[in-house]
Amino acid sequence: MKMDLIKRTVFTLLFANFLIFSANAQTNSKKSVTPPAKPAPTVTLAVDATEAPRKIFHAKLTIPASPGTLTVYYPKWMPGEHGPTGPVQDLAGLKFTSNGQTLTWRRDLEDGWTFHVEVPAEVTSVEASLDFISPAGGEAMYTSGASATDKLTVLAWNTVLLYPAGWTSGEVQFEASLKLPDGWKFATPLPVTSQSGSEVKFQRVSLTTLVDSPVSSGQFLRVVELAPNPPEELDIVADSPAALNVPIEVFNPYRELVNQAQKLFGAQHFRDYHFLYTLSDHVAHFGLEHHEANDSRLGERYLVDPDLRILGAGLLPHEYVHSWNGKYRRPAGLATPDYQKPMHDDLLWVYEGLTSYLGDVLSGRSGLRTPEEYRNNLARIAAGLDHRPGRSWRNLQDTADGVPSMQGAPHQWESWRRALDYYDEDVLNWLWVDTIIRQQTQGVKSIDDFCHVFQGPPNSPPQVKPYTFDEIVNTLNQVAPYNWRGFWIERLTNHGPGAPLTGIENSGWKLVYDEKRTPLIENWEEERKEIDARFSIGLDVEWSGLVVDTIEGMPAAKAGIGPGMKVIAVNGKRMTKHTFHDALQATKTSQSPLELLVENTDYYTTYKLDYHEGEKYPHLLRDESKPDVLSDIIKAK
């Protein structure tokens, strides 16, 4: 584009913005003075979870109302989920009454999370009853995912409530109670006022605080104290007592995690903190952050099995960091006044990306990962991004911007479609930032100094302090002057080729490949029942032979294999994990092509892959020509 055209375009945009501003100003000036707002209502909510093993929850609400049309919302845009994921599809049995009379209601035609109720004269409150049906398995995640088994459940309050329109979520108050199955114990950051048998009553709080305070409960609960001031604890519910039967020393790294996080940030922004850790093979597996808790869920044996502990070592640190980065400091576009206003996800490279970097660093500093385990994880992240052809058409910024429209995208074709890459790619980018800060200050400062300024003192109870892109840039410049605006614009709009490896290289290491699988990859393959051949022939395939993904431009894709097909045989022998690994390694000394018999919608084809380089797996190799900065980054402080 020629400069004259650029100047004209900029002028046109500025002038258009001026006209919009002027029009808004004129419109606002004509408005009458707004009368004093009505006092915010208090809603009572009684949840009956005694049928949680059947995966159904019953709720009754009393909502203040006046004659006319009462508009109520089912929460839609959920914090931490970054999209319109409120599971309204699992809302059932909805009924509104007043003084014993059933009231007419209708769902809004333009928004399925909004309901309009006709309230008769002289009515001051409306009773609502509803059921929430928790999915029995499936691939749904977060509060839409499976959350109950025969022995446990995690209650996300947003799934069992409605709230009246006209106020922010911070203004509407809730008095909540919960009835649990007999004998079940519970844990939550929500203050309790009383308990009688299996019924618990909670302190009146804002809707914001209620939704931010899940309840974990079950027949088998183990509580591990991590720190006294402020109180922090690990609350573990599991499907069996055996899943909780680990020596107390296993929890030492979690105590050190709390200690190292305090040193990293220099302050906390919670009154107490609960790691709500669910161990079950029958709930959705994820982590979801809250101000004073995290809802983290993994398989039943993730605590008792050392190999699985390594595989899941990054989850709790990540969700814990979110208390500072995401809950306390939050992008302005995510700091919405209620759960209906659309969120803007453009700064997820900070919200999730920086959290991923800091969570991994804390996993190293706390001892949840050894230095080698940390490096193996970093190598796998880097190699995955280095084999991500979707970067050629879709930049990092769009992986954040597009989150609301990409919810529930399948794993097939993920390497070409791209997914939530602002997690992993920004581990590499924030490592790069950390090394630049160290270089610019001759090793005096690091990302720790940024965290102190941006998310640190003073201590406070839960609150939200929004930020913008400009504040990120300005705070980085406060720590270490540099062209941070240019750096981040380049990182967010870059298309490669290849992953951003400069942070690894600046820290004294190099990404290399050899035929040896790291324990991390071995554990990943065992847990997922998959073979990770992405770095050799560009194939991710289940032990059953089902092709999960292929990487464009690599041998499997070039030969014609695609996701959804099924490998039946390898070099004429039935497909198994051992057959596949052995045949792939044998290509290094064989002149013959690797032959895969593949089923595709009832048809069989033998694909011949012209590949002769054996198995390839990523590692980090020490670069002795540079200081070992990476080891210093993950060293306990």
At which residue positions do the language-model features occur?
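Compositionally biased, proline/threonine/alanine/serine-rich low-complexity intrinsically disordered stretches
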Residues: A25-K38, R301, D632-K637
